[in-house]
């Protein structure tokens, strides 16, 4: 694989990041990816500071390689975890669900490389101005929360708009897709769905089986009505949710939002892949083992 400024700057064997997937990206998966030569990432999610500290320290016992933390900026504990990553000596942070601007000075002073996930050129430019080391341009093919632009359209536009390195995400599962985004100007890739079936991934076997059995047309985007579109694998819940989403006369936004609460944990931890949310990207059908 080609060597780029990403792996060279971070001391990686490969310029491959593991996505900071909520309820999935724990110490076990992060350590596994880092030990294999990529950048493993722990998802802070809605963890408080001490919960994240525990996961970071657990990861340190499992690898002596560099690993990162993904911080969800809309978390009520974002302030706490923003301090914990500094205290624990984390060297790479990826961010999502908000603007990391208020924490940038603190992180940069600590020598942390901040790499925000961006769905648009405008946000990429803003992050460059604020001091980001790189940006992750994530297309709508990805699992979880998605933007409007595809990876093929977004990546070259971001590459042309900023001078910092661009990492491509969304719709990447094998070497052909990695080569393709490098041709678009990316310096690295972030992969999520492909890692869901890894032995180091601690999600339920039912969730893994759902990925392994997925067809090319099996993902769907829900949540557009609330302004938070999410890509997942079709199941009984997505069908019920979609029906409710289009029934605005009888289903309020609040009721719709409540329908989605706890669904990801239900699939990941309890193995309920019928009524839980099985987040996955459009490349799920390419994952066979």
Residue ranges and their predicted role:
Residues 1-165:
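Active-site entrance/lid segments in N-terminal catalytic domains of soluble metabolic enzymes
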Residues 153-167, 173-289:
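Conserved active-site-proximal phosphate/metal-binding subdomains
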Residues 21, 171-172:
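Active-site metal-binding loops of divalent metal-dependent hydrolases
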């Amino acid at each position: 694989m080609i060597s780029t400024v990403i792996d060279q700057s971070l001391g990686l064997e490969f310029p491959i990041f593991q996505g900071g997937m909520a309820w999935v990206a724990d110490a076990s998966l992060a350590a596994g990816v880092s030990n294999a030569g990529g950048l493993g990432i722990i998802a802070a999610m809605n963890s408080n500071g001490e919960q994240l500290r525990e996961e970071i320290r657990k990861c340190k016992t499992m690898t002596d390689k560099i690993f990162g933390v993904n911080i969800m900026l809309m978390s009520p504990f974002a302030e706490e975890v923003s301090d914990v990553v500094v205290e624990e000596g984390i060297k790479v942070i990826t961010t999502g669900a908000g603007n990391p601007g208020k924490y940038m000075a603190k992180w940069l002073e600590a020598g942390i490389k901040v790499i925000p996930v961006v769905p648009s050129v405008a946000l990429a430019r803003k992050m460059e101005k604020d001091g980001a080391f790189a940006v992750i341009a994530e297309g709508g093919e990805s699992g979880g929360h998605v933007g409007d632009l595809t990876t093929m359209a977004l990546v070259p536009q971001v590459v042309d708009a900023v001078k910092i390195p661009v990492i491509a995400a969304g719709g990447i599962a094998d070497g052909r897709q990695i080569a393709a985004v490098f041709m678009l100007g990316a310096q690295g890739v972030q992969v999520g769905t492909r890692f869901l079936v890894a032995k180091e991934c601690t999600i339920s076997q039912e969730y893994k089986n759902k990925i392994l059995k997925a067809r090319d047309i099996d993902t769907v985007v829900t949540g557009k009505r609330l302004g938070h579109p999410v890509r997942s694998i079709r199941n009984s819940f997505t069908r019920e949710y979609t029906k409710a989403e289009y029934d605005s006369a009888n289903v309020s936004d609040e009721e719709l939002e409540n329908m989605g609460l706890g669904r990801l944990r239900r699939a990941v931890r309890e193995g309920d892949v019928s009524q839980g949310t099985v987040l996955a990207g459009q490349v799920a059908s390419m994952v066979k083992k």
